[in-house]
Amino acid sequence: MPRVTVLMPTYNVAPYVKEAIESVLRQRYRDFELLVVDDASTDDTLAVVRSIDDPHIRIAAFDNNVGLAENLNRGLALIDTEYVARMDGDDIAEPFWLEKEVAVLDSHPEIGICSGGFERFGTVQSLVRFPERHEDCMANMLFECSVIVPTFRMSLYRDHGLRYRTDAFPAEDYRFWAECLRVTKIYNLQETLFHYRMHPTQICTARRKEQQRKVAEVRRYMLEWLSPDFTEEEKSYYTGQFMAPQIASRQDYNERKSFCGRLVAKNRSVGHFDEAALRHRLDKHLRLTLYSTIVERYFKEGYSIPKYLHYLFGGLALKTGWHYEIRFLLKSLLLKGN
C-alpha cells in the first residue's frame, strides 16, 4: 500500500484534467496513488482520465452528482493511506509538491497539515503566500483560508471524525481547515508548489456571491472559537463592516480599531490564539483597508500629484481631517508589504 493518496475530485474538467493528472504522475516522490473521484461529469472528463494508462491511477466514478463537498467525503471513505494530498482536476502541481510536503509531515509529528505557496494563472495572474508559522496561520484564518493543495494526515479523518460540510459549500475547504485547526497544526512552505488555474467556469468564479456568504459563516465560526462571549451584534459587525475592504469615515476606522482591542482582550481569557500573531494580523487588516481606501479614493482615476494634493488639502478627504489622511497614507504605503 502506498503512503500517500492524491485525492482529485472531478466534475466537467475535460479540457484541463489531463494536464493536472500528468503533473501528479511527474512527482519525484513516488510512493503514492492518484484517486480520481468523478462526480457524474456530463462532459468527457472520465474518458480523458481513462485514456491515461498508469498504475498509480485509481478511478472512482459515480452516477449521482452530490456536489464537491460530499464528493470529497466519498473519496476520503475510499482511502486507507497514511497521508492524503488534496488537488483539483484543473490545477498543475510542481514535481516536488509531494516530496516537500511529505518531508515536513515526516519530520514534524505535531504538524497535521502541510501546505505551500501557489501561482494563479489564466484569467488572473499572481503569486500567493500564506503565513509560514502555525500561530500566524491561525490568526490569518480569522480572515481567510490559509491552506491550499495540502498534504494532511489521514488520522484527522479517522480519529477526529472531520468531514467536508456540504452546508459550507462553496467554502467547504475553508471550513474544513478551520475545524482541523482545533486538533492539529498547520505549516506553510514559502515556495510555489503548484499552479492554480483561474477560469470563468470554476466554482469560485461562477458562484462568487454565495462563496462570500459562506466565507462569512466560517469567519463567524473562527470568531466564536476565539471567544464564545461575543454578542450576535458583535458577530454581525465582525463579518460585515469590520471586514469591508474600505473605510467609510474616521468613526468607522476608530470603531474597527476599538474592535481589534476587544478581540485581543477576549483572546486572553481563552488563549487559543498567540497574542503577538493576533495583534500583527489585526494591524495588517487595518493597514490594508486604509491602503485600499486611499488608493480607491485618490489614485484610481490617475490624479496628478498637484491635483491629488489639492484634493487632499481641500478638505474633501472623507471628512476625516488632513492629518489623519497623510499619516495613514504614509503608514499604509510604507507597511503594506509586511
Regions found by a protein language model. Name each.
Residues 62-79, 100:
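Glycine-rich, basic loop-to-helix element that forms the pyrophosphate-binding segment
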Residues 84:
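Short aromatic/hydrophobic "clamp" motif used to bind/position activated sugar donors
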Residues 1-25:
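N-proximal low-complexity "stem/linker" segments adjacent to membrane-targeting elements
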Residues 77, 116, 134-242:
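Conserved nucleotide-sugar donor-binding catalytic segment
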Residues 15-18, 43-51, 92, 96:
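Acidic helix N-cap motif at the loop->helix transition within catalytic regions
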Residues 38-47, 64, 88:
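A conserved acidic beta->alpha catalytic loop
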